[in-house]
Amino acid sequence: MKQLSFLPGEMTPQDRRLIQRALRALDRHLHEPGVAFTSTHAVREWLRLHMAALEREEFRVLYLDNQNQLIAHETLFTGTINRTEVHPREVVKRALHFNAAAVILAHNHPSGETTPSQADKTLTQRLVQVLQLVDIRVPDHLIVGGRQIYSFAEHGLL
């Protein structure tokens, strides 16, 4: 099986079309009735395909209902090559707009390094705190760096 390049300048048009088809298929799967995020595998693959080749940091939120089914997803903030300013108030506002019971947070590190910075850890703690005030759970915060993904939940940081 051919390895896909995740560097934007190295992707062939064929690779881009293949990724777009995979994203559409995963999107359809994630929006099927009854599909719950009991396993993070599909979420990770979806995020990897969406975010691995981005040249600037993006902060995304996946909004889930009480059964952990996807309600909606969106990019809330876009930053520079090594930083994104995230406003907790906006995250809460959008989660309430979608009537979410839980949110999965995600952002990318264009450098490919997935280890969270102290700023990442502080932001995550702050978001968990403010979302708890309105009874919204945060099952995970994922950092995408190329083909690698770091999970705050798996590392005991949530």
From Swiss-Prot:
Chain positions recorded as Zn(2+) binding sites: 107, 109, 120
UniProt xrefs under CDD domains: MPN_DUF2466 (cd08071)
Classification via SUPFAM superfamilies: JAB1/MPN domain (SSF102712)
Keyword vocabulary terms for this entry: Hydrolase, Metal-binding, Metalloprotease, Protease, Zinc
A molecular-function term among this protein's GO annotations: metal ion binding
A Pfam short name: RadC
Residue positions of motif JAMM motif: 107-120
Gene Ontology biological-process entries: DNA damage response; proteolysis
Positions of the MPN domain: 36-158
Database matches in InterPro entries: MPN (IPR037518), RadC_JAB (IPR025657), UPF0758 (IPR001405), UPF0758_CS (IPR020891)
PANTHER family according to UniProt: DNA REPAIR PROTEIN RADC, UPF0758 PROTEIN YEES-RELATED
Protein family according to the UniProt entry: Belongs to the UPF0758 family.
Protein's name according to its UniProt entry: UPF0758 protein YkfG
UniProt source species: Escherichia coli (strain K12)
